[in-house]
């Protein structure tokens, strides 16, 4: 992500009027604060439910994909508890920082951690979806590509990277000696840091995800043309043909389920970039054009785009759970809703699943 080098986007709204806010701008700030409070409430409630559902459901907890979703929910939860409340605080006190400089650095560091960790979690989920479609029999092998242990290791690497990268300004790569100046808490980062962060934490993951979904599209096209079944037949010749042939018969059904899961992940990815792309583009424009561009844009625009970015943390939980039966069943149990005692076929189908099948529960 990209950030302004001398102040956060939302505090730029206050710099347009030295003698106080106009009536219309003051009203906009109040409305923005109300919307942000609503986003915080929904983001905390929704992501806590997602985390509780994954921890409380053995099938969800055993899925590598769901571990990535859990990590993404933690990112959104941290944003809603450690970053957004300070934005509300700033609006309520006319963008004057009334806390310590240490708390200012803690706020900006928390922001620098949560947003990149979200996009990197989305990247590893997309890579996992691509790999599951590229090698549909991976779940049946003795060692599938993405195991639970590997997923935990990847998640740890994502968080370590995000934390270390966010701490670089605190450790010395600063724009100026102090983060609090003129009673404002500023993002004390250099232009070079912002540009590097843009490439590593936004542009590169975006291009990588585009690559993965392009490959997924090509796999789907090959399936429709019948090319993929030939490759499966060849694989069945080379390793345990008798065993694989029985499982290959179920390949198309599993492929459809994995493809549906990939589409649902794509919706989550699209929502993230829809919410954060405008904020990032505006930040880059302000970095390369200088502060003179502030006189050419509406004063409400920076805070409005930041609000749109924060909205993503509240949108994700419904996107995770809308098409997932395990989530719905877990929520029903949590809230005391009982399922109708019918559907014997579904029950028998579930018991027919092997333990390896159950580890492949995805967003469907």
Predicted features along the sequence, with ranges:
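Extracellular TM2-ECL1-early TM3 structural module of rhodopsin-like
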Residues: 25-33, 61-125, 132-143
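Cytoplasm-facing ends of alpha-helical transmembrane segments in multi-pass membrane proteins
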Residues: 44-55, 80-85, 113-137, 156, ...
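Intrinsically disordered regulatory tails of 7TM GPCRs
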Residues: 1-20, 141, 224-262, 267, ...
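Helix-to-loop junction signature of class
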Residues: 36-39, 53, 78-94, 108, ...
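Loop architecture of class A 7-transmembrane GPCRs
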Residues: 12-22, 91-110, 135, 143-154, ...
């Amino acid at each position: 992500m990209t950030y302004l080098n001398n102040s956060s986007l939302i505090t730029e709204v206050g710099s347009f009027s030295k003698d106080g806010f106009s009536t219309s701008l003051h009203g906009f700030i109040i409305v923005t604060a109300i919307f942000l409070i609503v986003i915080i409430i929904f983001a905390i409630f929704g992501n806590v439910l997602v985390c509780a559902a994954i921890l409380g459901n053995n099938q969800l907890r055993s899925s590598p994909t769901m571990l990535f979703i859990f990590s993404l929910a933690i990112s959104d939860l941290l944003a809603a508890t450690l970053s957004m409340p300070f934005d509300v605080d700033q609006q309520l006190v006319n963008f004057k920082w009334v806390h310590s400089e240490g708390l200012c650095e803690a706020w900006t560091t928390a922001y620098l951690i949560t947003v990149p960790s979200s996009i990197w979690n989305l990247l590893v989920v997309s890579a996992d979806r691509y790999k599951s479609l590229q090698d549909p029999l991976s779940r049946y092998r003795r060692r599938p590509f993405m195991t639970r242990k590997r997923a935990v290791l990847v998640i740890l690497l994502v968080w370590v990277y995000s934390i270390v990268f966010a701490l670089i300004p605190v450790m010395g790569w600063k724009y100026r000696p102090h983060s609090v100046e003129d009673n404002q808490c500023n993002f004390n980062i250099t232009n070079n840091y912002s540009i590097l962060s843009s490439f590593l934490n936004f542009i590169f993951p975006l291009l990588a995800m585009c690559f993965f979904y392009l490959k997924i599209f090509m796999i789907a096209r090959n399936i429709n043309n019948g090319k993929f079944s030939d490759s499966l037949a060849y694989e069945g010749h080379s390793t345990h043909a008798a065993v694989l042939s029985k499982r290959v018969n179920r390949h198309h059904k599993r492929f459809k389920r994995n493809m549906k899961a990939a589409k649902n992940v794509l919706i989550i990815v699209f929502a993230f970039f829809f919410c954060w792309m405008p904020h990032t583009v505006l930040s880059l424009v302000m970095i390369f054009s200088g502060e003179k561009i502030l006189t050419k844009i509406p004063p409400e625009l920076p805070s409005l785009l930041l609000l749109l970015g924060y909205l993503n943390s509240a949108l994700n939980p419904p996107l995770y759970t809308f098409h997932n039966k395990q989530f719905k069943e877990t929520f029903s149990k949590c809230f005391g809703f009982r399922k109708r005692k019918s559907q014997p076929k579904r029950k028998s189908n579930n018991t027919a699943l092997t333990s390896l099948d159950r580890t492949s529960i995805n967003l469907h």
